Amino acid sequence: MREVAFLLASLLSVPAFALSQAAKEFMKITAELEPVQCEKRKLRRAIALAEIERRNEDVRSLRQRFAALDRDPKTARMERRLAELEPRLEKSSDPEDLSAINRQRVEAFYRCE
C-alpha cells in the first residue's frame, strides 16, 4: 500500500520537473518581479484615470513614480533577462512550459487586484 501511495505521489509531482530550465528561470524571475509589476499596473491605471479627469499635476507625479520603478537597476536587469528568455520559450518543444507560465501570470494578475 505504501508503495502505491509513493508511486501516485511521484507521478503527480512529475509535471513540475517537466519544465525546461528556461521556463523555470522565467517563472522564478517573474515571481521576483511580481510586486514591481503589480505596482506598475496600478500606476498605469491611475495615470489613465488622471489623464481622463485632466489632473495634470497627478499625471506628472504618477509618471515620475513609474519612471523611478523603471530606473531601478535590479528590476531593469531582471526584465532584460525575461526579454532574452521569451523567444526561447515561444519555440520551446516542452508543451508544459507555456501553460505553466500562463497559469503563473493569471495567478499573479488576480493577486494584484
Where are the model-predicted features located?
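Sec-dependent signal peptide recognition
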Residues: R2-L7
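N-terminal signal peptide c-region/cleavage motif recognized by signal peptidases
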Residues: S13-P15
